[in-house]
Amino acid sequence: MKLENQLIDRLNIGKNRYGHGVRVDSDTTKWGTPANSWVEMAREELLDAIIYIVADYIRNHEDPRVISEPDDNKRILEYANNIERIKNPSHKLQIWNLTNLLHSQLFTGDQRTF
């Protein structure tokens, strides 16, 4: 599916869920960001993407959770912080890409030009 179609689908989901499309002048703190910033909103979404991709990796490529553990948060953090432990190259690449995006100047606030 083309990127444009995927974006339209996501915009429609938001419109149906919230009753309107994206309003760029909206205060993002109403949706939980600490600052009124669409970049902050994107940063949170990238962090969520890392969590979801690691969760998918664990589900499909590692042993199931020990029943005594209430969730997989600790395992997710272990893999996210040590991507060399991720054996599947597709999962590893996506985590690497997302991590590098989060370290880019747009998300770090570093306004120097390179």
Name each model feature, range by range:
Residues 1-114:
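Intrinsically disordered, low-complexity regulatory regions
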